[in-house]
UniProtKB/Swiss-Prot annotation:
Source organism of the structure: Sulfolobus spindle-shape virus 1 (SSV1)
InterPro entries linked to this entry: B129_C2H2-Znf (IPR054177), ZN622/Rei1/Reh1_Znf-C2H2 (IPR041661), Znf_C2H2_sf (IPR036236), Znf_C2H2_type (IPR013087)
ZnF (C2H2-type) ranges: 75-99, 101-124
GO molecular function terms attached to this record: zinc ion binding
Protein name (record): Uncharacterized protein B-129
Entries under SMART domains matching the protein: ZnF_C2H2 (SM00355)
Length: 129
């Protein structure tokens, strides 16, 4: 399966020649072509997984906001999605800030912030490192 790019104004398309097209900017296309074959395989595996398991997209709003925050900083609070410049700042934020006790992904309620953080890490694999 090879990717081809088809020019369409300011947008480019990635295609597997089987009818699935993804709109990307020229910058995104350049970055895609710089990826290793393993990274490209991972992207295809993620897309296939989401196509075969669309229920995973039920958490898409939260996951999109999480990824957007991660683009700013690798240190993001999993409960409020606030980005921080360091791991220390994030841990201080979690320790001293009162957070919601509701899971931002599945909306399950908890009695403490710690139990909500524990749940988000164990059930949704979004952990504070």
């Amino acid at each position: 399966m090879t990717e081809s790019d088809v020019d369409s104004g300011s947008k480019k398309y990635l295609s597997n020649h089987k009818g699935i097209f993804i709109h990307v900017t020229l910058e995104e296309l350049k970055r895609y072509h710089q990826l290793t074959p393993e990274q490209k395989r991972l992207i295809r595996a993620i897309v296939k997984t989401l196509i075969h398991n669309p229920q995973l997209l039920d958490e898409s709003s939260y996951l999109y906001r999480l990824l957007a925050s991660k683009a700013i900083s690798q240190f993001v609070c999993p409960l409020c999605l606030m980005p921080f410049s360091s791991s220390v700042s994030l841990k201080q934020h979690i320790r001293y800030t009162e957070h919601t006790k509701v899971c931002p992904v599945c909306k399950k309620e908890f009695t403490s912030t710690d139990s909500a953080l524990d749940h988000v890490c164990k059930k949704h694999n979004i952990c504070v490192s």
